[in-house]
Amino acid sequence: MGRGTWSWIVPDGLWEIAEPLIPPSKVRPQGGGTQDTPDETVFAAIIYVLVSGCAWRALPPCFGISKSTAHRRFVIWSRAGVWGRLHEEIVHRLYDASLLDLSRAVLDSAHVRAGKGGEHTGPSPVDRGKPGSKMHVLSDANGLPLVVGVSAANVHDSLALKPMVAGHQTRHDPHRGRHFKPQRLHADKAYDVPHLRKWLRGKRIGVRIARKGIESSERLGRRRWVIERTMSWLTGYRRLNHRYERNPRNYLAFLGLAAALCCYKRLVRLTT
């Protein structure tokens, strides 16, 4: 997209990475109809919603699209896995530039309210039982988000460990057959479960999980502070502060796009 129309909201160069991942629009067999809104315009509008937290109906007139067009295209692209693939592509570029630190990975979660309910919501133990969800994040040693996930607020953190770590290890470029694996995993006492420690050792991943009632959280926390910063980066995208989407796939899509933006900004800052 370069320094184009939407450079005020879309980081330079991001559209060029995203464009090949966008599924083609369906063509009416009978022809006719109105001309499709350009994909890059919709892409910019989606990022605006993520950053500002506004409702689809509150999109500024400068985008020149209706709320139904923007939301419909967002749902189609989310179903096609565009946001996860965009995040993955940027993570690979970071790896190619030797900007990922896999000497350790850090895992944590954060609660978000989900007033509209829907799948993957439940009574939040930290919000007086109100409906909520959790965002789960696995980062590298520098806090770059590698894998993101969503669960109900009443699901125990430990249940996310295997899916998050397995998702990290199976993210690979099919043309290179390359797998990423951290040397050690840092997490707080919520993940202190014997069978998870055994599972990690079976994967040849060092276990640095705080033990309940034994190890000081302050000592191990020296390595885990980066994930708190990562959560701050992600929740800086206002659409993530409250889950408005009843469909968890759509909330996960916004979370994946936010993770992609965090990683892309680091890539640009360290390579230009």
Place the predicted regions along the sequence by residue.
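Short alpha-helical elements
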Residues: 1-272
